[in-house]
From Swiss-Prot:
<feature type="binding site">
    <location>
        <position position="91"/>
    </location>
    <ligand>
        <name>substrate</name>
    </ligand>
</feature>
<feature type="binding site">
    <location>
        <begin position="82"/>
        <end position="83"/>
    </location>
    <ligand>
        <name>NAD(+)</name>
    </ligand>
</feature>
<feature type="binding site">
    <location>
        <position position="104"/>
    </location>
    <ligand>
        <name>NAD(+)</name>
    </ligand>
</feature>
<dbReference type="GO" id="GO:0004459">
    <property type="term" value="F:L-lactate dehydrogenase activity"/>
</dbReference>
<feature type="modified residue" description="Phosphotyrosine">
    <location>
        <position position="222"/>
    </location>
</feature>
<feature type="binding site">
    <location>
        <position position="42"/>
    </location>
    <ligand>
        <name>NAD(+)</name>
    </ligand>
</feature>
<feature type="binding site">
    <location>
        <position position="231"/>
    </location>
    <ligand>
        <name>substrate</name>
    </ligand>
</feature>
<dbReference type="InterPro" id="IPR001236">
    <property type="entry name" value="Lactate/malate_DH_N"/>
</dbReference>
<dbReference type="InterPro" id="IPR001557">
    <property type="entry name" value="L-lactate/malate_DH"/>
</dbReference>
<dbReference type="InterPro" id="IPR015955">
    <property type="entry name" value="Lactate_DH/Glyco_Ohase_4_C"/>
</dbReference>
<dbReference type="Pfam" id="PF02866">
    <property type="entry name" value="Ldh_1_C"/>
</dbReference>
<keyword id="KW-0520">NAD</keyword>
<dbReference type="GO" id="GO:0006090">
    <property type="term" value="P:pyruvate metabolic process"/>
</dbReference>
<dbReference type="GO" id="GO:0006089">
    <property type="term" value="P:lactate metabolic process"/>
</dbReference>
<protein>
    <recommendedName>
        <fullName>L-lactate dehydrogenase 2</fullName>
        <ecNumber>1.1.1.27</ecNumber>
    </recommendedName>
</protein>
<dbReference type="InterPro" id="IPR018177">
    <property type="entry name" value="L-lactate_DH_AS"/>
</dbReference>
<comment type="subunit">
    <text>Homotetramer.</text>
</comment>
Length: 319
């Protein structure tokens, strides 16, 4: 591979993409930030708007409009482009149309001579990330999905509101599909080593509060989409966080979507959100959280759902 740097190419300048661009500029994560979209006037305006704010960025960043040839020397290509999720539509129902869009985009990226890392956010993210990996033949650690990073943040926030602590003080994870079969790993959730599940049960006298928090976490996107059309701030910040871990070689453990190779019950091939070490070499090490028997069964169900869905679009891997 080429010398590692901090050039990022964003493909997709919709609500998620533009919010991600804003987050990257305000955090000063990239040295060069290129935006690609078929809506070229929108890109031109966003580039102008963002560059007007770079004087306030913590480090210099050059924001520009680009084309696919700009991917040739990119360190990180982030794809948010795709058909949006409609009110009442599940992420998995998006699968065929967004896989076709993804195939076209990725072919153009690879034709440029791209030799960096992919970060996928378009939905259904686990399916599309696996598709990109299998279509390109790149090593799994270089094809990463946003996974359940956002879902875990939602869970941490909701728990923090119940317990009166900062969200960053909550150690809790959502794993599995970024979607309806995701699961909260209550057996490991804690604040300062104290079980969140037990604390919630003690405070309320029942197990209902934990279930309520899980459901509100799982269904948050549906509620937001119903009210304002799409979710974008939360996922944009999650993408910035993953990008920062890669570009700054942070060695952070994040619940990205990555390909299993025998972990969590022997599953192989499937992409889904699990705790993974992320640095400048990509998603390099999966951490296996101890799961209860019930949690393992839910995880297995999530795997099957994703496997069955991927089987339905496998034919698109053929040129």
């Amino acid at each position: 591979m080429k010398t590692f740097g901090k050039k990022v190419v964003l493909i997709g300048d919709g609500s998620v993409g533009s919010s991600y661009a804003f987050a990257m500029v305000t955090q000063g994560v990239a040295d060069e930030f290129v935006i690609i979209d078929i809506a070229k006037d929108k890109v031109k305006a966003d580039v102008q708007d963002l560059n007007h704010g770079t004087v306030h960025s913590p480090s210099p960043v050059d924001v520009k409009a680009g084309e696919y040839e700009d991917c040739k020397d990119a360190d990180l290509v982030v794809i948010t482009a795709g058909a949006p999720q409609k009110p009442g539509e599940t992420r998995l129902q998006l699968v065929e149309k967004n896989t076709k869009i993804m195939k076209s985009i990725v072919k153009s990226v690879m034709d440029s001579g791209f030799d960096g890392y992919f970060l996928i956010a378009a939905n259904p993210v686990d399916i599309l990330t696996r598709f990109v990996k299998e279509y390109t033949g790149l090593p799994a650690e270089r094809v990463i999905g946003s996974g359940t990073v956002l879902d875990s943040a939602r869970l941490q926030y909701l728990i923090s509101q119940e317990l009166g602590v900062a969200p960053s003080s909550v150690d809790a994870s959502i794993i599995g599909e970024h979607g309806d079969t995701e699961l909260a790993v209550w057996s490991q959730a804690n604040v300062a080593g104290i079980s969140v599940y037990d604390t919630l049960k003690e405070q309320t006298g029942s197990e209902a509060k934990a279930e309520e928090i899980y459901v509100n976490t799982r269904d948050a996107a549906y509620e937001i989409i119903q009210a304002k059309g799409s979710t974008y701030y939360g996922i944009a910040l999650a993408l910035m966080r993953i990008s920062k871990a890669i570009l700054n070689n942070e060695n952070n453990v994040l619940n990205v979507s990555i390909q299993l190779d025998g972990q969590y019950g022997g599953h192989k091939g499937v992409y889904l959100g699990v705790p993974t070490l992320v640095n400048q070499h990509g998603a390099v090490k999966i951490y296996e959280m101890p799961l209860s028997a019930e949690e393992q069964a839910l995880f297995d169900k999530s795997v099957k759902t994703l496997e069955d869905t991927f089987d339905s679009i496998k034919y698109l891997l053929e040129d």
